[in-house]
Amino acid sequence: MICRSCGYKTIKIHSTPLLPECIWPSSYGNYTLSKCNVYSCVKCHHLQLQNFSKKKILSFYGTDQLNLDKTETHNKRLLDIKNNFGKNFFLKKEMLDVGGGVNPIIKNKKLFIADFKIQQDVKNFYKEHWYELDIERQKINHKFDIIFLIHTLEHFKNPKLAISNIKRSLKDEGRIFIEVPNFDYYTKKNTYYSIFHQHLSMFTLKHLSNLLHINDLYIEKVITKTNIIFCSVKKNFEKKKKINKINNIFLLRKLDKNYKEMQKKIIQHLNKEKYDVYGSGGSMVLALSSINKITNKINFIFDNDEKKNNKIFPTSKIKIFKFTKKFFKSKIKSISCYQLNKKGNLNIQKI
């Protein structure tokens, strides 16, 4: 397979268990399972999944797309930027949010939105300030001071093409603010969230830096580095392409070891008993999907997000309910994706 970052050859270095291709609850309950195969570029060390068609990639998101982000999370990002670049940083700036078709980073009518599909309420609010297009294939003929790329880069089939087109719309002294999941973090903790179909590329700080250098960009400042990498990026006029050497085989071996430990903790906790599930998001779906037939023992699934209620949990035929006390059984074991003051509960965020 050809590297979708630099065009060189790759080698296969890892395969996941069978995972649901769409990790979101749906109204229909029809799910396809397949493995994710991870390929490492011999030259630039980019990590990518196997090739999928555009039509196949769209199917990973299902028909019942959910809004995964929150206003307070966006507000924290904006505050972090102001703390690093000044409280008036956004004044008189032309701004573009690539991938903001569902949940734009700023509710400001001067912001431009670019996405392959933009919700009607977003179109209505931003008037003519939107581009409904595939940024991997199409260019935007306008220059911006600031471009946001928030949890979008990892979803591109061809990140080099996307970055190249985004760069064309950046003013020479402009900045791109990029946020991606930190793959290094997920090789050690919450490993169930490390590799799945929607994330077509995996980035540590070095992997991200390599992709940017190939496109004559560089990381100006790392704003946050935890389970995510949030950084400012600028054009590199020196044209020096510094490629970091990365031992991807070592990285995936570390993941494999910690992934097995995660599976072991879940199996030991549930001990083949009936159990309740609290939280039905992608993290829970991936955690339970990592263990064969474990969903057969689910008693009830609860989620207080009304958009998920009465929908079907992936890899099962079980409906999701809003939690009420009438369902509560203190003696039955449970697994959750948040802190739950209940005896016999395992919080997957802690493993």
Regions found by a protein language model. Name each.
Residues 209-241:
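Substrate-binding/catalytic lobe of Class I Rossmann-like enzymes that use SAM or dcSAM, i.e.
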Residues 2-12, 205-222:
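A SAM-dependent methyltransferase catalytic signature shared across enzymes that methylate proteins
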Residues 1-150, 163, 225, 237-269, ...:
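Conserved N-terminal segment of class I S-adenosyl-L-methionine
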Residues 17-25, 178-201, 205-211:
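Short, glycine-/aromatic-enriched active-site segment of Class I SAM-dependent methyltransferases
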Residues 150-152, 157:
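Short catalytic micro-motifs in class I SAM-dependent methyltransferases
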Residues 160-175:
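A short glycine-rich, Lys/Arg-flanked "PGG" loop and its adjoining helix->strand segment in the class I
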Residues 230-351:
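Hydrophobic, well-ordered beta-alpha structural blocks that scaffold small-molecule cofactor pockets
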Residues 115-117, 182, 304-305:
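Residues in the short beta-alpha loop(s) of Rossmann-like NAD(P)-binding domains
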